[in-house]
């Protein structure tokens, strides 16, 4: 499939940086988008020049001036790139924390078989606008390989949310998931919860602002 060979990215040298004053102004607003980009398919993913440290791209670089972008040419060095690779002690606590999240997401690409090789099942078509879910602010899907399943939720909202995610009968049939009680572990936090999986049932989730949950569980056949 062509999607397995498409490079996914949120930032490049042509686009304004997520953290720039011209765009979101906050690198944490890019985290839920990165969760989706990294985990949705088997495709390669790119992290661009200090994105993992929250590079703002607000330097007045050469010919382009202050435009919220970071050049690919070697006449300029972004401050966060220099600190991140040559002087990590100079990184702020926030920059270090953001970097650890990006590192963890990239490790999941290689470590988790459901991400490397697994099937994808979109859950957005059954999770409509309601007091329990906002499709304009949350994005949900499943990944599965063998007996390993990931329930991925990205929250683009600026507030912590309590949501209910519907898993339709079609997902159980397509992925070969039996109805059963499972213990889910969030790969981002280590938090565990027990869920009774039912066709067309709901899973209650608590998700932080500009963040997500990557719940992993194993099924018994």
State the predicted function of each range.
Residues 3-12, 17-181:
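Loop/helix patches that line or flank the sugar-binding groove of alpha-linked glycan CAZymes
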Residues 124-125, 189, 206:
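Compositionally biased amphipathic helical and low-complexity segments enriched in hydrophobic
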Residues 195-221:
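C-terminal beta-strand-rich structural cap/linker in extracellular carbohydrate-active enzymes
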Residues 181-201:
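Solvent-exposed beta-strand/loop surfaces of large extracellular or lumenal domains
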Residues 162-166, 183, 194, 204-206:
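Ser/Thr- (and often Asn-) enriched beta-sheet segments in non-cytosolic proteins
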Residues 142, 185, 216-218:
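Residue-level detector of conserved, well-ordered beta-strand and adjacent loop positions
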């Amino acid at each position: 499939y062509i999607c397995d060979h498409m490079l996914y990215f949120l930032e490049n040298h042509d686009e304004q940086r997520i953290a720039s004053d011209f765009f979101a102004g906050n690198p944490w607003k890019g985290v839920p988008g990165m969760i989706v980009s990294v985990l949705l398919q088997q495709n390669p993913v790119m992290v661009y020049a200090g994105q993992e440290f929250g590079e703002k791209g607000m330097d007045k670089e050469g010919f382009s001036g202050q435009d919220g972008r970071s050049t690919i040419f070697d006449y300029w060095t972004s401050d966060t790139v220099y600190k991140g690779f040559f002087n990590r002690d100079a990184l702020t606590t926030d920059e270090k924390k953001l970097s650890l999240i990006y590192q963890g997401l990239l490790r999941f690409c290689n470590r988790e078989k459901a991400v490397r090789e697994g099937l994808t099942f979109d859950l957005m078509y059954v999770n409509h606008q309601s007091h329990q879910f906002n499709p304009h602010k949350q994005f949900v899907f499943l990944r599965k390989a063998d007996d390993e399943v990931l329930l991925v939720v990205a929250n683009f909202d600026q507030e912590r949310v309590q949501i209910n995610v519907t898993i339709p009968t079609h997902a159980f049939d397509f992925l070969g998931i039996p109805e059963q009680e499972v213990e889910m572990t969030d790969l981002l936090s280590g938090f565990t919860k027990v869920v009774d999986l039912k066709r067309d049932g709901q899973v209650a989730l608590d998700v932080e602002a500009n963040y997500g949950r990557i719940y992993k569980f194993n099924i018994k056949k």
